Structures are given as structure tokens and as C-alpha cells.
């Protein structure tokens, strides 16, 4: 198997094709989609991507919907923080 260089990492499989800037964008996506994420249910780093937008924990078996390349999208994080703030205000006042 061919050795990838330190610089290009996971996108070394594309060689010199497609241009440098596109390979940099693809590297960011592929690194995030292949990494493990923290499971909110069991508290371990065991969540991996199963398919586009489907993330599953190997430890507790929970399946969660998320983004295509990352587990949490920016809009989902915003909605969640607003919801938590609204619920906290309802409890307090």
C-alpha cells in the first residue's frame, strides 16, 4: 500500500488530481467524518458515522441523526442552546 505523506494526510489517495484547494476542503470533511465523537448518552468516545447523517455509538448502541460530515451541525447547536435557555427561563421565572 502506498505511503501517504505527512502534509496531505488522508487525501493522499487523490495524488495530484483535483487541485490543492479542493483537496484541502475534502481533507477537512474526511477527517471529521472518520473521527470518533463523544456520546451524550453513555459518556464515552464511541460515536462513529454509519451513513450520511446517521451516527451510532458502538458502546451503548444509540443512533442519532446529525450532519453529513460532522455529528453536530452549526444550526443544530444554535437551536439546542436556544431551547436550553428557554427551558431554563421557564423553570426560574
UniProtKB/Swiss-Prot annotation:
The keyword tRNA-binding does not apply. SUPFAM superfamilies: Zn-binding ribosomal proteins. Keywords: Metal-binding, Ribonucleoprotein, Ribosomal protein, Zinc, Zinc-finger. GO terms for biological process: translation. A zinc finger (C4-type) spans 39-60. One of its GO terms (molecular function) is structural constituent of ribosome. Pfam families: Ribosomal_L37ae (PF01780). GO terms for cellular component: ribonucleoprotein complex; ribosome. HAMAP family: Ribosomal_eL43. Belongs to the eukaryotic ribosomal protein eL43 family. This is Large ribosomal subunit protein eL43. It comes from Brassica rapa subsp. rapa.
Amino acid at each position: 500500500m502506498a505511503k501517504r505523506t505527512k502534509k496531505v494526510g488522508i487525501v493522499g489517495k487523490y495524488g495530484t488530481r483535483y487541485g490543492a484547494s479542493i483537496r484541502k476542503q475534502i481533507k477537512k470533511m474526511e477527517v471529521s467524518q472518520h473521527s470518533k465523537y463523544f456520546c451524550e448518552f453513555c459518556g464515552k468516545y464511541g460515536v462513529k458515522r454509519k451513513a450520511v447523517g446517521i451516527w451510532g455509538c458502538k458502546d451503548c448502541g444509540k443512533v442519532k441523526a446529525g450532519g453529513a460530515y460532522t455529528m453536530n451541525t452549526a444550526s443544530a447547536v444554535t437551536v439546542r442552546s436556544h431551547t436550553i435557555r428557554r427551558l431554563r427561563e421557564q423553570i426560574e421565572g
